[in-house]
């Protein structure tokens, strides 16, 4: 019998978990409160920091607690163009400026946003990667819903009370620079997770992978595989509808609903 293959080992356990030792913390919007629902609250950007394992810079924003005599520090996804010492306003009546946090329903159509809430109060789930942004498409005041275009190009209908940061996520163009050497890839994935270097299946022995073995490196069987095979055999092109090159030209018309 063969060994437990890599795809099976990627489950419970510490081997493939993210390396979170030096992370700075979870980057989220403020908890929704009375000040944000009915007016605005002012904070100041104290620092812009790097978070290991994340390509996006983070902004340390300090707010006065509206209910206690103390200050609270929040970690925001930094929007491109913000700077230390800048005032950040969060709330329904805040101005539409870069870095401010507003409900989607009060933004004009065509506004560029990031760190968008998927559900009201979840503190930002969509368009958070470096250089990403979503676009406000339309509003429906009757149903209190808004339509946004996500970085993937998909369009999503969300509640108009969902909050978002105005602007584009900082750190855009990060992946344009080539890695060039293995040492940089080593350090990149050292702070992310144990997924590098990745050995090819055909380079393994037969006990370690279904594609392993042979006098030369070849798969030796169809690389397509059905959906319901056991986990130790499920490698290659899983339940592929088609394989090979996409030949010819095909025009796709985007439907506007």
Curated annotation (Swiss-Prot):
Alphabetically ordered keywords of this record: Cytoplasm, Ribonucleoprotein, Ribosomal protein, RNA-binding, rRNA-binding
What subcellular locations does the record give? Cytoplasm
The UniProt entry lists the main location of this chain as cytoplasm
Which example biological process does GO assign this protein?
cytoplasmic translation
Q: Does the keyword rRNA-binding apply?
A: yes
Q: What does this protein do?
A: Component of the large ribosomal subunit. The ribosome is a large ribonucleoprotein complex responsible for the synthesis of proteins in the cell.
**Name by which UniProt lists this protein:** Large ribosomal subunit protein uL2
Q: Which organism is it from?
A: Ictalurus punctatus (Channel catfish)
Q: Which gene encodes it?
A: rpl8
């Amino acid at each position: 019998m063969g060994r437990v293959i890599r795809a099976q080992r990627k489950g419970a356990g510490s081997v493939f978990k993210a390396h979170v030792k030096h992370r700075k913390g979870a980057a989220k919007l403020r908890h929704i409160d009375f000040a944000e629902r009915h007016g605005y609250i002012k904070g100041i950007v104290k620092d812009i920091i790097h978070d290991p394992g994340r390509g996006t810079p983070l902004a340390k924003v300090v707010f006065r607690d509206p209910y206690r005599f103390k200050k609270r520090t929040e970690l925001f996804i930094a929007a491109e163009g913000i700077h230390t010492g800048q005032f950040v306003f969060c709330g329904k009546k805040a101005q539409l400026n870069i870095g401010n946090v507003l409900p989607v329903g009060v933004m004009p159509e065509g506004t560029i946003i990031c760190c968008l809430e998927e559900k009201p109060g979840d503190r930002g789930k969509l368009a958070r990667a470096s250089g990403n942004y979503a676009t406000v498409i339309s509003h429906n005041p009757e149903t209190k819903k808004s339509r946004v275009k996500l970085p993937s190009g998909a369009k999503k209908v969300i509640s108009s009370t969902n909050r978002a940061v105005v602007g584009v996520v900082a750190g855009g163009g990060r992946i344009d620079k080539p890695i060039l050497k293995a040492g940089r890839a080593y350090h990149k994935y050292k702070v992310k997770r144990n997924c590098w270097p990745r050995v090819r299946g055909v380079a393994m022995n037969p006990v370690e992978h279904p594609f392993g073995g042979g006098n030369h490196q070849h798969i030796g069987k169809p690389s397509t595989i059905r959906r319901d095979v056991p986990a130790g055999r499920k490698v290659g092109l899983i339940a592929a509808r088609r394989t090979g090159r996409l030949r010819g030209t095909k025009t796709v018309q985007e439907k506007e609903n």
